[in-house]
């Protein structure tokens, strides 16, 4: 910034006056007068023009006070002056002569406009002293300056350093040293949106307390105290042009009681930081989210929803439980305990591997009746990939069923013969209707036979049995080339030896019991089998010994009944050692408190080996 220097020469018998008024600069300069010329040829010039050297050349016009005697030309004069801020002229008398003219130092004038360098980033003006009489007030013009290390009094309680401007070339960056203020009322720039006042230090004796006035502002990097227990940084406003964005630094608060919203359904309290001296501990109060739908991943294959009831004006919480997608589970039969082990953790789109260890069979089933097949415990169960879901305790009492079309291409022409008789021996893949090979998106009919329904007897008929919920439609559908899959838990009514009796089989019946009836049931590990005899037209019968069973225990049971051409049907019952027959639907359950069946369709636990 350049200021023109005006020199006024007043001549009194070879004497002239110099008035100097210069801007605020903190150093002493020497100005070399290059030349001085008169405006006329008279003995006393009207004015003298002085050309001086400096960072920037400028012209100063000097007016004599009168046309008294004086010289009109001064060459190579040197003026020494002290540059300082002032608005009031000082007058000095020097002798006018050829050659050099020496001007004495100019003293600063009080009450002038001055400029102070500070470390802030905003320019402002403040009045330090008010005008009094003829003495003007002092005005302080505060301007930001780059490349200077300064100290600013700040209302916070922590001292830190921050660089406002990055160094460029030989110009150093600006470093702001922030120190806490003691005993003063100050204002701190804060990135929040609420204005408030807090006392950081109480008054002591003649020293006043420190009061912190918090004001919101934009475009400043600040620190906010937050009641959570995680530290993070977020940008509230993006930078625009030369205006920087607002960055909010969130820090955990120490020694306060805070509340965190949690998406679960359980409320609890935990202490994160123990109390120490006068500092209270941090207590985290975890509350369930109000009216929030949350999703929990579970390794089963059943999706269900549970509702936490609303209370007063608080809406209920809905928890949606979904099966884990793409989880590969391997079932291994060994040992006597059921355990689950994760072999590989899921990564990105690659599913993890979960290994489910099931106890090996502990009961040897045997029998001497026709068509009964006995398996030794040393038999190795088929290797498979299955998922066993967690059961719910309030399983619906009843028996589940599903009806499919017989669509095994390799045997359909023989089993579903349009002429002649059904080749019952061609149906050797019962597990197909519960395996991943099944080529039907959903069953034709499915439902539950509850305890209020009759025994699921399928009297030999050209149509399917009329089971609920759509008994009319199902009962009017042809039974030709159809397969019905049944699954249920048999609750043992009394402690005794039981058997399963199957009668009126038309055309083929397969049965599985125990854990393999839930998953791992295959084309070769069935426990009982019966079929229609083409030679004499007699329906199939079978009796399978289930061994000694304990009252109120649950036995998993699965049946597959298939009909080729013509009529179809079958009937069954559970019989104790005294010959008492038990209604299957009265003692059948869809699930227990620890087990449940997989849904019908692909992945129903079948192994089409």
Swiss-Prot record:
GO terms for biological process: flocculation. Residues 75-391 are annotated as: 9 X 36 AA approximate tandem repeats. GO terms for cellular component: external side of cell wall. Glycans are attached at residues 75, 161. This is Putative cell agglutination protein pfl4. Pfam families: GLEYA (PF10528). Sequence repeats lie at residues 77-110, 111-146, 147-182, 183-218, 219-254, 255-290, 291-325, 326-361, 362-391. Residues 1-21 form the signal peptide. Residues 427-589 form the PA14 domain. Belongs to the mam3/map4 family. May be involved in agglutination during conjugation or other aspects of colony formation. Induces flocculation when overexpressed. Keywords: Glycoprotein, Repeat, Signal. The gene is pfl4. PROSITE patterns: PA14 (PS51820). Gene3D superfamilies: 2.60.120.1560.
């Amino acid at each position: 910034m350049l200021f023109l220097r005006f020199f006024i020469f007043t001549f009194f018998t070879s004497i002239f006056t110099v008035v100097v008024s210069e801007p605020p600069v903190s150093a002493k300069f020497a100005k070399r007068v290059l030349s001085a010329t008169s405006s006329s040829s008279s003995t006393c010039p009207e004015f003298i023009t002085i050309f001086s050297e400096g960072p920037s050349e400028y012209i100063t016009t000097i007016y004599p006070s009168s046309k008294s005697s004086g010289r009109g030309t001064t060459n190579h004069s040197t003026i020494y002056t002290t540059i300082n801020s002032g608005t009031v002229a000082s007058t000095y008398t020097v002798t006018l002569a050829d050659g050099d003219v020496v001007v004495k130092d100019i003293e600063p004038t009080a009450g002038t406009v001055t400029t102070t360098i500070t470390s802030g980033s905003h320019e402002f003006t403040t009045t330090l002293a008010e005008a009094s009489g003829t003495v003007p007030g002092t005005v302080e013009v505060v301007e930001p300056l780059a490349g200077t290390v300064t100290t600013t009094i700040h209302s916070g309680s922590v001292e830190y350093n921050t660089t406002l401007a990055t160094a460029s070339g030989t110009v150093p960056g600006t470093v702001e040293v922030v120190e806490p203020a003691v005993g003063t009322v100050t204002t701190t720039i804060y990135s929040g949106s609420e204005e408030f006042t807090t006392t950081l230090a109480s008054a002591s004796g003649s020293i006043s307390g420190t009061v912190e006035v918090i004001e919101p502002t934009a475009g400043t990097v600040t620190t906010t105290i937050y009641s959570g227990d995680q530290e993070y940084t977020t940008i509230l406003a993006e930078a625009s042009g030369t205006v920087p964005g607002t960055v909010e630094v969130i820090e955990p608060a120490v020694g306060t009681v805070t509340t965190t919203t949690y998406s679960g359904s359980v409320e609890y309290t935990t202490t994160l930081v123990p109390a120490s001296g006068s500092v209270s501990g941090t207590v985290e109060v975890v509350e369930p989210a109000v009216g929030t739908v949350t999703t929990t991943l579970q390794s089963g294959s059943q999706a269900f929803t549970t509702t936490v009831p609303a209370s007063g004006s608080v809406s209920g919480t809905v928890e949606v439980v979904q099966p884990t997608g793409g989880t590969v589970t391997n079932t291994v039969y060994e040992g006597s305990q059921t355990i689950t082990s994760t072999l590989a953790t899921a990564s990105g789109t690659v599913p993890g591997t979960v290994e489910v260890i099931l106890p090996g069979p502990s009961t040897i089933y045997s029998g001497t009746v026709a068509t009964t097949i006995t398996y030794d415990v040393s038999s190795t169960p088929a290797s498979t990939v299955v998922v066993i879901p967690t059961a719910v305790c309030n399983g619906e009492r009843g028996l589940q069923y599903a009806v499919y079309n017989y669509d095994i291409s390799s045997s359909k022409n023989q089993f579903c013969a349009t002429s002649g008789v059904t080749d019952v021996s061609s149906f050797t893949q019962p597990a197909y209707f519960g395996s991943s090979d099944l080529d039907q998106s959903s069953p034709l009919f499915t439902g539950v036979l509850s305890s209020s329904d009759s025994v699921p007897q399928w009297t030999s008929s050209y149509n399917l049995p009329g089971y609920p919920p759509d008994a009319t439609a199902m009962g009017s559908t042809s039974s030709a080339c159809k397969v019905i899959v049944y699954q249920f838990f048999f609750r043992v009514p009394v402690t005794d030896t039981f058997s399963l009796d199957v009668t009126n089989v038309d055309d083929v019946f397969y049965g599985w019991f125990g854990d393999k009836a839930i998953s791992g049931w295959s084309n070769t590990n069935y426990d009982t089998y019966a079929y229609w005899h083409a030679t004499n037209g007699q329906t199939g019968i079978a009796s399978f010994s289930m061994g000694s069973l304990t009252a109120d225990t649950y036995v998993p049971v699965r049946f597959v009944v298939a009909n080729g051409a013509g009529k179809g049907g079958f009937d069954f019952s559970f019989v104790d050692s005294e010959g008492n027959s038990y209604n299957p639907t009265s003692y059948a359950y869809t699930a227990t408190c620890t087990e449940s069946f997989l849904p019908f369709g692909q992945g129903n636990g079948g192994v089409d080996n």
